[in-house]
């Protein structure tokens, strides 16, 4: 069993939910930080998780960000299971970006 720290970056090209990170089929993951940066103006970001065991999307964070500012929308650790998907949706296609800090736990 190996623990690996990873970063997943977010820089939207569409206003639809975009996959930022997918948990490998042989691992679990703990999301420790979801940091979003708004360069200017007012933007909305939504964070969701697709639970692969139930094929259901759950919104886990919502941020109305007036820039310029940086905010962390993860208010605590988020545990993801095998094949779960973390997605971020933005109200605009530019001026907002971010990073997700993840501890991936390989179960092999």
PLM regions and their residue ranges:
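C-terminal interaction-tip segments
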Residues: 1-33, 37-40, 46, 90-108
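Short, surface-exposed beta-strand/strand-loop-strand elements in extracellular ectodomains
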Residues: 40-63
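Exposed aromatic-hydrophobic patches
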Residues: 70-77
């Amino acid at each position: 069993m190996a623990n690996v720290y990873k970063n997943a970056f977010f820089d939207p090209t569409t206003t639809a939910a975009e996959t930022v990170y997918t948990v490998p089929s042989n691992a679990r993951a703990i999301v420790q930080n979801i940091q979003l940066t708004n360069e200017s103006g007012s933007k909305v970001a939504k964070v969701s998780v697709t639970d692969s065991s139930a094929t259901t999307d759950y919104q886990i964070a919502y941020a109305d960000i007036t820039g310029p500012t940086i905010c962390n929308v993860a208010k605590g650790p988020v545990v993801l299971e095998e094949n779960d998907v973390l997605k971020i949706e933005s109200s605009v296609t530019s001026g907002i970006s971010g990073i997700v800090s993840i501890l991936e736990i390989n179960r092999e």
